[in-house]
Amino acid sequence: KYTTMKQATRAQWIKCAIAILLYLVFLIWVRSWWGLIVIPFIFDIYITKKIPWSFWKRSKNPAVRSVMSWVDAIIFALVAVYFVNIYIFQNYQIPSSSLEKSLLVGDFLYVSKMSYGPRVPNTPLSMPLAQHTLPIVGTKSYIEWPQWKYKRVPGFGNVKLNDIVVFNFPAGDTVAVNYQQTTDFYTLAYGEGQRIYSKQIDMDSLTREQQRAVYDLYYAAGRKQILNNPRTYGEVLWRPVDRRENYVKRCVGLPGDTLQIVDGQVMIDGKAIQNPENLQFNYFVQTTGPYIPEEMFRELGISNADRTLMEDSGYEIGLLEMGLDSRNAQGKLNPVYHLPLTKKMYDTLLGNKKLISKIIMEPEAYAGQMYPLNLYTKWDRNNYGPIWIPSKGATITLTPDNLPIYERCIVAYEGNKLEVKSDGIYINGEKTNEYTFKMDYYWMMGDNRHNS
């Protein structure tokens, strides 16, 4: 049964006015006037009641009323969670040890969406509480159409140095499903390509153009290998920005900064930044003979997932090359652990002379590939860069030396077509040696530096 506007009570009009006013404030905030089409429905809920929103309440069948009451509650909860997660805050669980010991694996975070301003979803039709895949059934948790362009509404502030930030992994646009928890598609493709062309190439003897051709060959071969072997690598999927894996890192570089790592110390514009209290690196720790007691691991805060006992005989040659050669009376190598340690933990272990024989920082041979994947450098995790971080409106001169650093920003994030031909660089069909960035960029890094 519906009512006329004359029959509506004063209380109904007040509630309706408040609801519409709040909704208009919301539309102004998100700058989306398409939402005005919802106002007649709000008016109907409070005043005219022509749409039978609660038709099931009048059913004579108690089973219908019971089932529909649950359906009604679930739909309301899902809609509420959807909007809260997008515009106010969202719960996340830490998936990796990247920020150990500041944040631990499995920790739950409530992340404010209003600090930097909520991002309007790229894929609005999605299931709340599922990032990209529905549990059990394993299908996509979102519908790819429609897709909205990137837009962020005003928030309370901007990203600052040392802020801990949750973001969608930029290189997660393409994933090989069987490897999505361990590496991105591009790192996997370059790595597989290098494995296929296993012959060592003297990159120092090549020009930048020749080096680029080698990396292009690696990527093409690796990509073909992945696409042609779905049983091994899984289906290859493309994901919109808001459906890529969530990462949590610390901001160590802002737009316009020049970042460099010197002997493990992050430098911004030539000056050392303040290190996080729980900054840690990976080490190999050899004892004088006994195993490290569980009690000591608990006191140090080193979890089972963070430690590896290098007992397999296959490790021996590598350990000896590092100088971890302490042996017991039977000639067997004393126990060696692979551990992430803060400075305090390092000093505690090193000071225990009765238990600890040697501590060696993890060599670069244990490091994986580093950004950019198609640029030959002699950078490593402890000595890296310098790299200038792009800022909106800034123009750079493109050269063979810096193009691999910025081409992903130009192509994947800012939507341009880039080609490198024999006579130069072409962007959107025009030859150029300059590019002006459309967006700000930030450098994120974990406190667990060698695992980030």
Pin down the residues of each PLM region.
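Extended hydrophobic leader/signal-anchor segments used for secretion and membrane insertion
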Residues: Y2-S452
